[in-house]
Amino acid sequence: SLRRKLLSTTTIGSLVHIGYNSFPEINSKIVQVCAFSAHAARVPEFLARYVNLNSAEQSANKDDVFLGRTAELTTSVHQEIFSKLPGSPLVYWLSEHFLQMFDTNSTVSDFSVSDGQNKTGDNERYLRCHWEVDVRSIAEKSWIPYAKGGPWRKWYGNVYLVICWTSSARQHYKKDKIARLIPEYLWYRDGVTWSFITTKDIGFRYLEPGGTFDVGGSSLFFESEDLVYSMLAMLNSKPATTILKFLNPTISLQVENVRSVPVPVFDMNRAA
């Protein structure tokens, strides 16, 4: 909201991205800092200057890098382009062509469905590792595979849990004040899943049909199996990873961030 207010009511004149290692007493990547000047009025098409000091490894070098900065450290950008991005991030280091993808393409939200996540309200009672239950009960859908995130991994895997899926268990998920059950039209569908907490990197995986998921294994669903594979390939690409890292630079990858990724125009019948 602060960024949106700045972009809509002021004009950024210049911004120095001090970045990591800004404080000698910390001297780490815990805190990032920037300094900027702004005019208290909107000046359309004003070309602001942005200076990136992240190349300095130690805080003591920041002054030297700024005073001796080269052209490679300075970028000029019209701030109007930031307002078109989800969350209005000031990603001055990306090319204008890259940023214009949000203007000229559809996004994942145009092709996907998201309608909440399951929540048991009592994981000790309703969740098991798949080897802890009789395999016949999984075949009979008394227990079904349950995507709940896990360590970084691309393409496939990390589904080692099962959730109790008996009629009485589902009634509990519906009625309990803490628990939640996703709508029936999403039961057992294949899709794309990922770990909500992304401490290492971002990795998307195929969610097989016959299972379900919770917020730890956030998931999206699509109209066809071919589209699932196409979107999985696109989301695991380097451009998509770059976009997601500036849409949400934290370790918690939200569904809304993934659905905001622009989708290039391509033939879905030939993709993947």
Cite the ranges covered by each PLM segment.
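Residues immediately flanking
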Residues: 40, 149, 196-197, 222
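Short beta-turn/strand-loop junction motif enriched in small, turn-promoting residues
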Residues: 20-23, 152, 199
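Short Ser/Thr-interspersed hydrophobic loop/turn segments at strand-loop and sheet-helix junctions
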Residues: 147, 185-203, 231-245
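Signature of N6-adenine DNA methyltransferases within the class I
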Residues: 1-137, 158, 168, 172-175, ...
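Contiguous C-terminal substrate-recognition/catalytic subdomains in enzyme active sites
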Residues: 132-185, 193
